Amino acid sequence: MKKRALVSVSNKTGVVEFVKGLLEQGIEVISTGGTKKLLEENGLQVMGISEVTGFPEIMDGRVKTLHPNIHGGLLAVRDNEAHVAEMSELGIQLIDFVVVNLYPFKETIAKPDVTFADAIENIDIGGPTMIRSAAKNHKFVSVIVDPADYDVVLAELKEKGEVTDETKRKLAAKVFRHTAAYDALISNYLTEQMGEESPEILTVTFEKKQDLRYGENPHQKATFYKAPFAVASSVAYAEQLHGKELSYNNINDADAALSIVKEFTEPAVVAVKHMNPCGVGVGTDIHEAYTRAYEADPVSIFGGIIAANREIDKRVAEKLHEIFLEIIIAPSFSKEALEVLQSKKNLRLLTVNIEKTTSASKKLTSVQGGLLVQEEDTLALNEETIIIPTKREPTEQEWNDLKLAWKVVKHVKSNAIVLAKDNMTIGVGAGQMNRVGSAKIAISQAGSKAQGSALASDAFFPMPDTVEEAAKAGITAIIQPGGSIRDEDSIKKADEYGITMVFTGVRHFKH
């Protein structure tokens, strides 16, 4: 009996060549709508779906393949005598290949002017039903949803006269991944349209971007997946201009650097090591900003990741070329800068659209047996709601330093302390189990520069010991959330030493 293939695709890539290959193997082809028209325009003889169903396509094509003559041909168990007899009695013919990809729902909802009606109209019904039927019966049916698999199927047909069982199983698994992702996009879109923030079932879908050499350590396997829609200013959608492939740790560090540099509208440069900032500088131009970021910690920047929010020009590139770096991220690189930096063959150069995130996207964190979901911490300092409980208010220079330190501290692993002075960080204390310990590290790192600097803390002071350490170092201004039952002790201690202190009312833990 002649084998048959049903072909109905929205993504027409390679379909003409593939169907030509099927016809050359003596396979009869059934097709629908626009796919049938394209194939016939290219001189390929195919059968219309109505010839199989005996029923016309109706309701603007909404109903065309939902018919027993189609699904009977797909789902029949061919070594089941009862199934075979039933097919013969009803005049149903077998279908051996299904080549289908689905209505472009993802592409439709990505359009800025999409209407709800347009989105709904691009929810495919017949396509998912067909490929699920075929995938369920993959012992007998080959189902192809990805044009990348066309060559594999044709090669096996030419070499062996059939598609191997292993390939059929792989194709079937891909189908169910395909439909699961498709349904996840639909459910997420409708959930967002209804404004539901915490649905009883969370559906997420990501697409493979690349396999990684290894994970956080060489013995760990790892893969990088990207969100289905382009996320402004993200590593997942950055363009790599030069250098080795990104590693797992590179991606984490680059993401951290991007998150920090997006805090600034003025020219800024951020240096990151192990997802913590080791130097942040701002200036009137990107060269001044880089100089400050470098001077913030010229030791830790070695082997680090640099993110800038302005184009890298030749002058800055020549300075960057002097030290070993893993990655440089910027909105763009001048031609002359690229010539300088590309002389280092392993240095990764990424371009990305640096944009401040205006709405809180969801952050997913895996735990054993579950997943934590929260909004990203994008809350900026609100100068209208701050409280200054001390006798002295910040000077203009202190206020500038406080704001810089506050922007940075929320990106430092808790317990976090950041010292800033003259448009740059001068000390970062990260990840200590007690707050005063982080303060001591930041102060030690700053050395004599701590005199006259500003200190930011990601959470309140449980006791006044951090204020005492700040006073010893000559720090003159502090910014912190406030809210401790011992706030009054810290306020009194600050007043005792003439330190101005700002309460933001906002905590910025980062774990």
Curated annotation (Swiss-Prot):
<dbReference type="InterPro" id="IPR024051">
    <property type="entry name" value="AICAR_Tfase_dup_dom_sf"/>
</dbReference>
<dbReference type="InterPro" id="IPR002695">
    <property type="entry name" value="PurH-like"/>
</dbReference>
<feature type="domain" description="MGS-like">
    <location>
        <begin position="1"/>
        <end position="145"/>
    </location>
</feature>
<dbReference type="GO" id="GO:0005829">
    <property type="term" value="C:cytosol"/>
</dbReference>
<protein>
    <recommendedName>
        <fullName>Bifunctional purine biosynthesis protein PurH</fullName>
        <ecNumber>2.1.2.3</ecNumber>
        <ecNumber>3.5.4.10</ecNumber>
    </recommendedName>
</protein>
<dbReference type="InterPro" id="IPR011607">
    <property type="entry name" value="MGS-like_dom"/>
</dbReference>
<dbReference type="Pfam" id="PF02142">
    <property type="entry name" value="MGS"/>
</dbReference>
<dbReference type="GO" id="GO:0004643">
    <property type="term" value="F:phosphoribosylaminoimidazolecarboxamide formyltransferase activity"/>
</dbReference>
<dbReference type="GO" id="GO:0006189">
    <property type="term" value="P:'de novo' IMP biosynthetic process"/>
</dbReference>
<keyword id="KW-0808">Transferase</keyword>
<dbReference type="Pfam" id="PF01808">
    <property type="entry name" value="AICARFT_IMPCHas"/>
</dbReference>
<comment type="similarity">
    <text>Belongs to the PurH family.</text>
</comment>
<keyword id="KW-0378">Hydrolase</keyword>
<keyword id="KW-0511">Multifunctional enzyme</keyword>
<dbReference type="InterPro" id="IPR016193">
    <property type="entry name" value="Cytidine_deaminase-like"/>
</dbReference>
<keyword id="KW-0658">Purine biosynthesis</keyword>
<comment type="pathway">
    <text>Purine metabolism; IMP biosynthesis via de novo pathway; IMP from 5-formamido-1-(5-phospho-D-ribosyl)imidazole-4-carboxamide: step 1/1.</text>
</comment>
<comment type="pathway">
    <text>Purine metabolism; IMP biosynthesis via de novo pathway; 5-formamido-1-(5-phospho-D-ribosyl)imidazole-4-carboxamide from 5-amino-1-(5-phospho-D-ribosyl)imidazole-4-carboxamide (10-formyl THF route): step 1/1.</text>
</comment>
<dbReference type="GO" id="GO:0003937">
    <property type="term" value="F:IMP cyclohydrolase activity"/>
</dbReference>
<dbReference type="InterPro" id="IPR036914">
    <property type="entry name" value="MGS-like_dom_sf"/>
</dbReference>
